[in-house]
């Protein structure tokens, strides 16, 4: 087995390698003067089971091209089986047509990864689970609910006043999965209506949050506007405190400042996307590593063991 890392999140790749007690494969992923991507694999991978670790986060197009070219290089070097390990799958929010003459970019990206030579995809908490069906190759979508539940138990006392909250109707299934792992905690839903692109307006809270310690749970925090508005609404409805757990911390623009100035007690995100300097500097943002989860999935795939047992 070989592990290869792109440039999008080398600290996570190194952490996964440490979990598996093996080194990263020597490779050079660099750019020419015109920013074309060039990849050289510096070790023999003929007949090997190779895992390429690369989130397609910002800059999404550059990191996607790196991934595709790495896969192509490995295929031409006679790698036996190539698994694209994509902790954060960019373009996942473009999973359907939202109007006339608009693309389904998530499907296009799935086609590109497949045609580049990948034999399998391993990802985590897709924005929409049905994106798995966009791939014509085996695709495993890891769920972070166990990882998050373990962290919550370490940092928050369990009790009847603990409540899991979905920041929108679309995330109810995700939030319910976390609630079940927290002694079947109560569930609430924030009904929000977007007032424009990149903006959100909280309208209503479904569930009684008065005097409850609320845990918001979602897959992506981009501008963090949804989270901060939801937290404000929960506090206005009598919540005792509000924390947030997010799988993918995109945290673009002024997101870190927005979190710092919000009523959130803290925002906990995985390291599926490498932390930006503003995120590292924000006292309310804390990272929990997904390396053990991804590393264990890689080990199971390489040994032909069940990956679904990780969801039990």
From Swiss-Prot:
Binding site residues for Mg(2+) 2: 168
GO cellular component: cytoplasm; ribose phosphate diphosphokinase complex
MF terms in GO: ATP binding; kinase activity; magnesium ion binding; ribose phosphate diphosphokinase activity
Catalytic reaction equation(s): D-ribose 5-phosphate + ATP = 5-phospho-alpha-D-ribose 1-diphosphate + AMP + H(+)
Enzyme Commission identifier(s): 2.7.6.1
Positions of D-ribose 5-phosphate binding: 194, 218, 222-226
Similarity comment text for this entry: Belongs to the ribose-phosphate pyrophosphokinase family. Class I subfamily.
Name under which the protein is recorded: Ribose-phosphate pyrophosphokinase
Source organism of this protein record: Caulobacter vibrioides (strain NA1000 / CB15N) (Caulobacter crescentus)
């Amino acid at each position: 087995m070989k592990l290869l890392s792109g440039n999008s999140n080398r600290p996570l790749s190194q952490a996964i390698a440490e979990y598996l007690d093996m080194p990263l494969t020597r490779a050079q992923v660099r750019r020419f003067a015109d920013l074309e991507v060039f990849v050289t694999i510096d070790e023999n991978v003929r007949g090997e089971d190779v895992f390429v670790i690369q989130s397609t986060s910002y800059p999404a197009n550059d990191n996607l091209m790196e991934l595709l070219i790495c896969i192509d290089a490995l295929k031409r070097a006679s790698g036996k089986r190539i698994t694209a390990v994509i902790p954060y799958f960019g373009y996942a929010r473009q999973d359907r047509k939202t109007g006339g003459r608009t693309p389904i970019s998530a499907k296009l990206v799935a086609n590109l990864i497949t045609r580049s030579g990948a034999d399998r995809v391993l990802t985590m908490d897709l924005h929409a689970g049905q994106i798995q069906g966009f791939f014509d190759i085996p695709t495993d979508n890891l769920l972070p609910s166990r990882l998050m539940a373990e962290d919550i138990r370490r940092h928050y006392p369990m009790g009847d006043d603990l409540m899991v909250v979905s920041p929108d109707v679309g995330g109810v299934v995700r939030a319910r999965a976390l609630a079940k792992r927290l002694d079947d905690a109560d569930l609430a839903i924030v009904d929000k209506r977007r007032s424009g692109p990149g903006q959100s307006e909280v309208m209503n809270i479904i569930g009684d949050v008065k005097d409850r310690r609320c845990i918001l749970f979602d897959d992506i925090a981009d501008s963090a506007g949804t989270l901060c508005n939801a937290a404000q609404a929960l506090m206005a409805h009598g919540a005792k405190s509000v924390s947030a757990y997010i799988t993918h911390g995109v945290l673009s623009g002024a997101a870190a400042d927005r979190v710092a100035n919000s009523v959130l007690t803290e925002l906990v995100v995985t390291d599926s996307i490498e932390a930006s300097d503003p995120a590292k500097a924000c006292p309310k943002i804390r990272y929990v590593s997904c390396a053990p989860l991804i590393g264990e999935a890689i080990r199971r795939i390489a040994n032909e063991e069940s990956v679904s047992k990780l969801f039990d």
